[in-house]
């Protein structure tokens, strides 16, 4: 890693990465941030930035929900069978599966009550692979493999306290060739220590 600085100020950077799209919109909407640096085209969500490093066809939410509804028709889900036909169940599954992928948890690692969903999770991953699609988290993981070789310049990262394992791996790989400033935005001393231990 070249350099990692922790600060509560937004410094001038070639790219500013934030954790979500709504944060990008919020940054772009305000003409200037408190530090007086213009927020503009260089503000990207981590997902968008990863797509620039390694373009990948990601599955949209509607398609993912359709896949899950279809799989629920044929794959038994044990103790969850009673609620499997509920309208909101595929959306809950989508969020849960996204979290599992983001934390790099494989279907075989599921235990306890979650093991009833092991076959469904594995089938969902297979369906994505068959269609040549990736989840947002898979796309970020693929970008991480390439990121260690990419030189971008100075990068500000904020909102990363919410990042999951796959996103942290991406930032870690990116730090191999780039200077990264982690912007904590006055989270306090405890967050600073936690962030430093978790990230780098």
Region spans (language model):
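Structural recognition of the conserved hydrophobic beta-strand(s) that form the central parallel beta-sheet
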Residues: 16-18, 156, 179-185
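Conserved P-loop NTPase "ATPase switch" module shared by AAA+ and STAND
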Residues: 151-163
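Conserved RecA-like helicase ATPase core segment
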Residues: 166-200
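N-terminal start-of-chain detector that recognizes signal peptides
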Residues: 15-16, 126-128, 153-156
């Amino acid at each position: 890693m070249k350099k990692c600085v922790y600060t509560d100020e937004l410094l001038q950077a070639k790219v500013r990465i934030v954790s979500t799209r709504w944060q990008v919109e919020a940054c772009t909407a305000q003409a200037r941030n408190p530090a007086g640096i213009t927020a503009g085209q260089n503000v990207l969500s981590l997902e968008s930035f990863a797509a620039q490093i390694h373009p990948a066809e990601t599955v949209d939410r509607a398609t993912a929900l359709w896949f899950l509804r279809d799989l629920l028709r044929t794959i038994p889900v044990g103790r969850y069978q009673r609620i499997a036909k509920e309208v909101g169940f595929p959306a809950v599954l989508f969020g849960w599966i996204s979290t599992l992928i983001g934390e790099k948890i494989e279907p075989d690692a599921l235990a306890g009550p979650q093991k009833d969903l092991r076959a469904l999770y594995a089938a969902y991953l297979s369906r994505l692979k068959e269609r040549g699609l990736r989840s947002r988290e898979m796309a970020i993981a693929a970008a991480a493999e390439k990121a260690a070789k990419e030189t971008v310049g100075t990068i500000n990262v904020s909102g990363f306290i919410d990042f999951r394992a796959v996103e942290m791996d991406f930032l870690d790989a990116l730090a191999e060739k780039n200077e990264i400033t982690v912007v904590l935005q006055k989270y306090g001393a405890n967050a600073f220590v936690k962030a430093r231990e978790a990230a780098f």
